[in-house]
């Protein structure tokens, strides 16, 4: 005897009009196959990520800032598939190629080329598919001779005068790493044009929050953000907008680091 089981959807949640419109703006004319294979999931996710989160009172960000944070977060959590899908959407929302490339370059100092290489390749592919001529105009502002000095100045500008001699501090066997932080991390990347210090600190915050396991550095860069004008409320908005892409544990860890940094800066 043939038994036929009918699968009945018990709790239907229609996708909101705002979510539909936002999705259409991100992916014009595209209909996800997940609507067929995973309808319950996609209804809940789309309504949350593309309506509830975006429209949460007091937690919104300008489009450019929001997309910078999301792309940096996806690089940090190694979400290459989602990054490739959303990069075009970020451009449709107005994020310029120079800023996109600078986010990717900035990531190398915090994630290493081993994790950033796929994102650099994907970025180049998407940009060229959209008619962007590569290479873009150069943004480097330092030379071999002055990168350490300029990097140190960037550290001082962001974190304060206490960083002036950091490059020559530390135990003899490892002080070269502090030197590299000055000449490479800050001298080669932070000194570039294309992103402001505030934008670089925000993207760095997103890299660290998304990769997890580096809370001391995340707390330090939360403090750096506050020093360059990205206050506690702003960082909470960044965490909120990126939460759908990294989940609750890392978002809550990031929030704890922001609270710790804000308390320290208030003393």
Predicted feature residues:
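Short, structured motif recognition centered on aromatic/hydrophobic residues
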Residues: 65-74, 100-104, 199-209, 218, ...
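A ubiquitous short alpha-helical element
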Residues: 29-34, 67-74, 166, 204-208, ...
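Extended intrinsically disordered, low-complexity coil regions enriched in Ser, Thr, Gly, Ala
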Residues: 78-101, 115-128, 212-237, 249-262
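C-terminal binding/interaction regions
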Residues: 107-108, 232, 242, 246
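Acidic, glycine/proline-rich low-complexity segments that act as flexible tails and inter-domain linkers
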Residues: 8-64, 84, 116-197, 227, ...
């Amino acid at each position: 005897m043939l038994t036929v089981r009918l699968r009945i959807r018990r709790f239907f949640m229609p996708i909101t009009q705002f979510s539909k419109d936002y999705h259409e703006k991100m992916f014009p004319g595209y209909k996800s196959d997940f609507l067929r294979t995973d309808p319950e999931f996609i209804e809940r996710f789309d309504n949350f990520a593309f309506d509830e989160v975006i429209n949460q009172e007091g937690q919104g960000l300008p489009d450019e800032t929001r997309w910078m944070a999301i792309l940096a977060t996806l690089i940090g959590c190694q979400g290459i598939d989602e990054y490739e899908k959303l990069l075009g959407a970020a451009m449709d929302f107005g994020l310029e190629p120079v800023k996109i490339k600078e986010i990717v370059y900035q990531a190398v100092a915090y994630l290493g080329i081993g994790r950033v290489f796929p994102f650099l390749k994907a970025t180049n592919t998407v940009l060229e598919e959209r008619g962007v001529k590569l290479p873009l105009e150069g943004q480097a502002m330092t030379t071999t001779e002055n990168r350490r000095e300029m990097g140190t100045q960037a550290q001082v500008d962001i974190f304060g005068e206490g960083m002036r001699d950091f490059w020559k501090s530390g135990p003899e066997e490892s002080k070269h790493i502090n030197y590299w932080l000055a000449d490479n991390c800050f001298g080669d990347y932070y000194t570039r044009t294309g992103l402001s210090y505030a934008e670089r600190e925000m993207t760095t915050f997103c890299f660290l929050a998304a990769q997890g396991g580096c809370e001391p550095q995340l707390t330090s860069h939360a403090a750096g953000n506050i020093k360059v004008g990205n206050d506690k409320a702003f960082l909470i908005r960044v965490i909120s907008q990126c939460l759908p892409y990294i989940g609750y544990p890392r978002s809550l860890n990031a929030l704890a680091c922001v609270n710790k940094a804000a308390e320290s800066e208030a003393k």
